[in-house]
Amino acid sequence: MGSIVEPWAAIAENGNANVTAKGSSRELRHGRTAHNMSSSSLRKKSDLRLVQKVPCKTLKNILSNLQEVILGTKLTLLFLAIPLAILANSYNYGRPLIFGLSLIGLTPLAERVSFLTEQLAFYTGPTVGGLLNATCGNATELIIAILALANNKVAVVKYSLLGSILSNLLLVLGTSLFFGGIANIRREQRFDRKQADVNFFLLLMGLLCHLLPLLLKYAATGEVSTSMINKMSLTLSRTSSIVMLIAYIAYLIFQLWTHRQLFEAQQDDDDAYDDEVSVEETPVIGFWSGFAWLVGMTIVIALLSEYVVDTIEDASDSWGLSVSFISIILLPIVGNAAEHAGAIIFAFKNKLDISLGVALGSATQISLFVVPLSVIVAWILGIKMDLNFNILETSSLALAIIITAFTLQDGTSHYMKGLVLLLCYVIIAACFFVDQIPQPNDLDVGLQPMNNLGEVFSA
């Protein structure tokens, strides 16, 4: 029996992981990034007094982990949406209901993935922890994109990724600057522009990679066939995607090695966090336990994401909303609500560097990692997905990047800047709300060649 109990005890090792930390030869610590700090604002300290009275060590460890992972967040009640979504899907209660419950269930899962990657970073060190956070930081968007590609829903992929970038640049950042300015109305809020500048350079590069395939179709003369134009656009997009991934790798090296100090979230001694923001300096769960929970959470995210992809058209028909509006506006708002709330809370506390790190860092990660990776995955699957997001979508992205860059150019902030960003987001949301133009071939704009250049405008 000992050979059976010991592995499970290792996987279920409890929150007293700091004992292992003190006994190890290396100190378990990591640089705190904006994503780590943002997610910590939604955590709450667990009361383990009852759990410690359990006589069985293995059972006590399992209960401790359950309490830390499931009950250690202010979003605990939202976990109820997960079994409800599974039941609704099993008994066919209604596909729009499945879509709504799945969206709600993704919210606490995304926050817990951030928590678990931070816990693993205590053991792996700052570099590997940073890479893990970079990979899992937008796990929901990446999983939805891959599942949508597997179902040949190219437009859903493009819409959802575009919506995530717009949401971070305008909604999250705008809300943070607005409420941060209101809460600190008697003093000017300042932030470090160095990190923002790096992110904007990369976002502009990503925008260039979206513009060129779009402009290529307009630049082609009438002698060039539509199929040839689409082939050139697809080849350019795949080449650009490889370049974007190289740029993202360089960005990770810049962020995690050469210029790490620019991206580490700093804590002020004279402005310490209160009890509402729990910042642990030691791990509360063990490595293998955290890894097992991370794998489990990822599997559940994949399950709910599959529900979202399968039912999005039914929700669109039932609610009278276009798929573009649901994908660009609703998916990012609900799916990343936890991370967004954390950014706003830290802006309230006059910690704009953390809020900017969350919004700009997430937008950069999607633009230079998730988007090109989706193109490469589609290429592997034999699906013709390019970087041409069409004229309306690409214009919205360009204007969002330009407006945000101008807003942050002087390193200071007030509530008026946040209000302008929010209003810009409302205008873009209204645009996609009234846009009821159907897409060809069941939304898969990347699969069907256009008959003439004039159809580019209506695509």
Curated annotation (Swiss-Prot):
Protein name per UniProt: Vacuolar cation/proton exchanger 3
Keywords: Antiport, Calcium, Calcium transport, Ion transport, Membrane, Transmembrane, Transmembrane helix, Transport, Vacuole
Expression (tissue specificity): Expressed in roots, stems and flowers.
Stretches assigned to the Cytoplasmic side: 1-67, 117-129, 183-195, 260-283, 349-362, 408-417
Annotated gene: CAX3
A Pfam family annotated for this UniProt entry: Na_Ca_ex
Transmembrane helix as UniProt keyword: yes
Originating species: Arabidopsis thaliana
Region (Cation selection), start-end ranges: 137-172, 335-370
